[in-house]
Amino acid sequence: MSLFGVGFLAFAKGKRVCAIGRSSLGKISDPLEVPNLLDLQLDSFDWLIGGPRWRAALDAYRKNPSGAPIAEKSGLDEVFDEISPIEDSAGNMQLNFSKPVLEAEELSVRECRVRGRTYSAPLYVEAEFMNHDTGEIKTQTVFMGDFPLMTDKGTFVINGTERVVVSQLVRSPGVYFERTPEKNSEKDLFSGRIIPARGAWLEFEVDRHDQLGVRVDRKRRQPVIFFLRAIGMTDDEIRDAFGEFESISVQHEKNIGLSRDDALREIYRRVRPGEQASAEAGRALLENFYFTSRRFDLARVGRYKVNRKLGVDVDPTRMVLTRSDIIATIRYLAALHLGFSEVAVLNSNKSVPISTDDIDHLGNRRIRPVGELVQNQLRAGLARMERVVRERMTTQDIEAIIPQTLINVMPIVAALKEFYGTSQLSQFMDQNNPLAGLTHKRRLSALGPGGLSRERAGVEVRDVNPSHYGRMCPIETPEGPNIGLIGSLACYSRVNSFGFIETPYRRVVNGKVTDDIEYMTATQEDEHAIAQASTPLRPDNSFVDERVLVRRKGGEVEVVPADQVDYMDVSGRQMVSVATSLIPFLEHNDANRALMGSNMQRQAVPLLVTESPLVGTGMERYVAIDAGDVLIAEDPGIVGDVSADVVTVKQDDGKHRDYHVGKFVRSNQGNCYNQRVVVRSGDRVEKGTVLADGPCTDKGELSLGRNLLVAFMPWEGYNFEDAIIISQNLVKDDTLSSIHIEEHEVSTRDTKLGSEEITRDLPNVSMDYIKDLDERGIIRIGAEVGPGDILVGKVTPKGETELSAEERLLRAIFNEKSMEVRDTSLKVPHGQQGTVIDVKLFDAVDGEDKLGAGINQRVVVYIAHKRKITEGDKLAGRHGNKGVISKILPVEDMPFMADGTPVDIILNPLGVPARMNFGQVLETHLGWISKQGWKIEGDPDWAKDIRVREAQPDSRVSSPVFDGISEGEITGLFSSVFPNRDGERAVGSDGKAILYDGRTGEPFPEPISVGYMYVLKLHHLVDDKIHARSTGPYSMIIQQPLGGKAQFGGQRFGEMEVWALEAYGAAHALQELLTIKSDDVVGRVKVYDAIVKGYPIPTPGVPESFKVIVKEMQSLCINIEVVSDGEDDVSADAETLQIEEGLDTSPKVEVGSLEEV
């Protein structure tokens, strides 16, 4: 579901309908529609619960088995089959699970969000208990806990908040061989390891003496001949398998008399040193480590990788190791050590090529999507439950046992709760704008349980790998310590059933490009020559050039004859992610700036008025619809009634469908998510037509910012170092205004002294403060509130001494509550203000709401605040060009064009050359051209590739990534722009115009680049950052004010600032800052008293931090006494000094208190 509680799934294969006609200036026509951008999340979870998408994919695979095989069982079926049967130690009893079923959910997504509940469905499973002694079978359907469900937008609602489970990028199970240079010689050392999905590793290595050894479960190394004997190989079998490899033959001859039992004992001794070694113990050890499915699991993908790498033909459903796996691994390693290019497969007439593995290659890394992550957590919960079941089997009366009495579902519920609530991969959803949410769901993380840690990850694993092409974006990644560890899925990529990322290519047959699409993994792609999407083609789809530039394995580029090309890219945007594909002229930008542009688009706040970009890339409509924040028609029909909240459509099948419109909903980041209806009563709508725009969308297109008239010029130094000057018009017209909604919550609980109460009757509070509270004591909707205003009146009982009879009588007569209770009302925090737009009251006593233990009522108040653009706010373009507003100029002072049009924004031209993001200049030029409109007369050479010959003013155009309009074509279009009313073109063919100084009316001496750029307002708003403190909390130890806005702290006067005052000899100012303005506890109380009474400021005393350092030195047994000139002990207790000075009535700070003074 969407944020609004009612979501409408964008159909996966159909066209997205968009009201804006955007003209493409690209040369390539994409043969493949961009797939549904949420498929990664939706398909994976659907497999887990055995939903319709997975069943449809399985049916399609059975009819046409191509590509990676689809899993035959759902995730829930798999995990319950694995744990069945559970037997007691004697083998007399057995418990089996089958047929897991999810019932209907209790609450809708919208209700879960409002009530703070988890969107889930009860999970039931059929449990069968069998008594082997009597042959009796008891079957029951057992409740296994509430199972959190995914909404149709790929999110989970956990305790009322939307969360995303990020897919994890991990090393795939399988067999890997690597070469490491020997430190003290020029030799290379080779090793091979079998890595399971679950269980002990098995490692083989060749040492510097060319001896082949084995490590069991990463313990001490031992000769490989011991292991071969231990798994039951005879002398003849060893000679047949390894006779050609001297390193093994020599070992074999040395240990010719070694028996299997001796080998098992030796292995056990090395793996479990200090324990009694026996052949039986060694046999059990190896059996448990590598040959038992409960302890060792290669998983489907691991078996696939082992079979493919070693050429063995083991059953794909066999998840444990076989002798043939071990023999083939040792043969491969021995052949690799000898420098062979291929090795023959035993008992077969085929051979496999030999090479070492690049662990960072995407053929060796796989995705653990949400379904697998949840399945693993469920498996862990079931394993905990299994122990409880076995325990109960031995303690309960066997006659009275039924499945329900054996099963305790708490371990399963706890495991799922732990995963969704605290796992590193279950994250608070980024709802800053639709693109942020969509990107979050497509994110790939190498961190998390079973993954890397940012401290240990080196440069190699973070770096771009040639196999990322078309699978993982080489540009979009965080800038901080997570760089390279967190990535994003490329536009066209998909994840197969093994977890490997596939990307589509067009098949090339005899030098002719077909429209047959084939998805390939990174390993498959390495075997082919692939041409880029921009390679010129003739009308019959044959290559224009006889020799074509292609990619080969390892990213090598070469030119080959056209008939040797195997495949061709499907689109120019194939290699980049969704956010990066939204940057026009990406090909003209430095990659570092493109990275910043991709990340900053996710920080754009939804504006009051949305406007689609003049210059786009063609991806805007896909993002807007797939993100799920626009309302789209699910079936064709005629629009009936239309209101702000509901759109009714009479469908062609005669049914009426109501579409609920979300109004002023708070997102996770405090932004206003609001939907606006864009259809009218009587309109005809088709399936996929946009009914209502959401935040940051305009007629079904993503619209993160506004098109502003920009000039590249310096202006009085105000745009020095990326600072930005904007026009007062942008403030007055609310061009860059946004609404932000804050949520404030208060609960009443049962305390030892009685229950808290929500009331209007507050002790010692004047009527002015409660004038906007209703009779319940809750703020009315529409009230304007500021810092300190009461939102919800609440009183809490407080303990008292025993009252006399007279006092009790007076209390009863006059009903003085002030003595019994204290005011604990919910107030507007410091620095916040706005209008109350909604109030929600939840009651556990009278209502049906579940509020948790001890909570009687919960009130949630929503306050909205409109923020206009102001100095200190951060603006950015899509090319990594960012800056802070330094000056808002009156419109009459802004530079203006010859026709009197003032520019909206002035940027520093020095921000372009050093950053090498020239795309912003080309966007500015094309923005001007599309704003004015054009008509190409005749058939000039520069226009031969432009399909749009005429465009009206204010047209929307797209310049697709790596297929955009060229500089020569832009220059030509400048000469084809429609002239103004005077018959002149304000901007010349070089993209520059004469601007006039708004203050003097004089023209500037040089022509200036002018045009329309798409500008975003980022979430870094000055109102959230600016902070001031008068009085506030102090640190417990050193009694200095705390730091930071969150703690309502003070401004730090640090070491270097002290040096600055010392340099100027400002001794009194410095003394004041270091004592009475900071941590001279006695002195600051004296100053307060002096200011109140109008006395002169007294002399500062001793700071508390000085006393702390004295105490620290005394704790090191250094006897220190500090005495003043009058022989007084300076370190005397502060409270004593206060009493001596007679200041006992002044406010005090308790040591350790964070209360205000």
Swiss-Prot record:
- Give GO terms: molecular function aspect only: DNA binding; DNA-directed RNA polymerase activity; ribonucleoside binding
Q: Which reaction does it catalyse?
A: RNA(n) + a ribonucleoside 5'-triphosphate = RNA(n+1) + diphosphate
Q: What is its EC number?
A: 2.7.7.6
Spell out the disulfide connections. Answer: none
Keyword Transcription listed? yes
Signal peptide range in chain numbering: none
Record-linked SUPFAM superfamilies: beta and beta-prime subunits of DNA dependent RNA-polymerase
Q: Which InterPro entries has this protein been placed in?
A: DNA-dir_RNA_pol_bsu_ext_1_sf, DNA-dir_RNA_pol_bsu_external_1, DNA-dir_RNA_pol_su2, DNA-dir_RNAP_su2_dom, DNA-dir_RNAP_su2_hyb_sf, RNA_pol_bsu_bac, RNA_pol_bsu_CS, RNA_pol_bsu_protrusion
Question: Which residue stretches, if any, does this entry annotate as coiled coil?
Answer: none
One Gene Ontology term, aspect cellular component = DNA-directed RNA polymerase complex
What are the GO BP annotations of this UniProt entry? DNA-templated transcription
> What's in the keyword line of the UniProt record?
DNA-directed RNA polymerase, Nucleotidyltransferase, Transcription, Transferase
Show the HAMAP family listed in the entry: RNApol_bact_RpoB
UniProt subunit comment = The RNAP catalytic core consists of 2 alpha, 1 beta, 1 beta' and 1 omega subunit. When a sigma factor is associated with the core the holoenzyme is formed, which can initiate transcription.
What task does this protein carry out?
Answer: DNA-dependent RNA polymerase catalyzes the transcription of DNA into RNA using the four ribonucleoside triphosphates as substrates.
Q: Which family does it belong to?
A: Belongs to the RNA polymerase beta chain family.
Per its record, how is this protein called by name? DNA-directed RNA polymerase subunit beta
Origin species, per record, is Tropheryma whipplei (Whipple's bacillus)
